[in-house]
A protein has these predicted regions:
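A short, surface-exposed loop/turn module that caps and links secondary-structure elements
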Residues: 28-53
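Short, cationic motifs built from Arg/Lys/His that form the positively charged side of catalytic pockets
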Residues: 50-51, 58, 78
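Arg/Lys-rich, positively charged N-terminal/basic patches that mediate binding to nucleic acids
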Residues: 1-25
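A generic beta-sheet turn/junction motif
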Residues: 54-56, 65
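Enriched for short, Lys/Arg-rich terminal
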Residues: 2, 13, 62-92
Length: 92
C-alpha cells in the first residue's frame, strides 16, 4: 500500500539543505510506505497527529487512511516544531 503526500523539499526553506534532503528522504522512504508503522502518535493538542524523528528534527504529520494520504503539517528542529504545529492547528 502506497500513500501519497502533500510535501516538497522547498516547503521548508529555513532548514539547512542537508537537513531538507534528510527530511525528504525520510518522508519518501518511511511515510509513503507505512506512515502508521514508522510514526509515533502525539498526545494533547496534537492528538491525531504523528511524528517521526530525523536526528534532532521532527516531522509532524497526519494520515487519512481512507484516501491513503499523508499531510505533513510541519518539519523542523525539535525545540520549535511542536509549537509550530500547534500554531498551524490554530489557523485551521
Amino acid at each position: 500500500m502506497v500513500y501519497s503526500k502533500n510535501f516538497t523539499e522547498i516547503d521548508f526553506p529555513n532548514l539547512p539543505k542537508t537537513i531538507r534532503a534528510r527530511i525528504t528522504k525520510a518522508i519518501n522512504e518511511r511515510l509513503i510506505t507505512d506512515p502508521i508503522k514508522f510514526g509515533k502518535p502525539l498526545r494533547g493538542r496534537l492528538k491525531g497527529y504523528r511524528r517521526i524523528r530525523v536526528s534532532d528534527y521532527r516531522i509532524i504529520y497526519t494520515v487519512n487512511i481512507v484516501k491513503y494520504k499523508v499531510f505533513v503539517a510541519t518539519a523542523g528542529h525539535r525545540d520549535t516544531t511542536y509549537e509550530k504545529a500547534k500554531s498551524t492547528l490554530n489557523k485551521l
